[in-house]
């Protein structure tokens, strides 16, 4: 298996993923759990991907240091369930040039609706709560074929996945990077 699999072991993320899998809390509480989980998982997924620049601004009286995200970089978070849009709303305030894209599984061919030009600075994050290999395969194939996206520009994030799903993906995509909180042995 040639996949780059990162098992997210941060205690807060593990706790939130467990709560979202097993809780029967109110809608408002679950919504808050999903928001927090989404923010933390996206953080873990892109922290090594994001490039920053340190700028020093000198005036006659003082010197300020600013840290900015590379302005050439842009991101698209692709997800398959409208209920998960709340997971990513807060990230839009933190990460510049972020697009959210809902692709419903009913229309597997709507990956052609992406409206971005393929460039090496564009990064695509596919998010599934529970990994769906059919959806992921169709989406990645469409991105590669229709938009000339390179596999290194794509990362996959899910709360849980099965070993057989990872094996299926490894047979198709060398070096796909996957972040997950739980791998279920099947």
Q: How should each PLM-predicted stretch be described?
A:
Residues 1-186:
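PRPP-associated nucleotide enzymes
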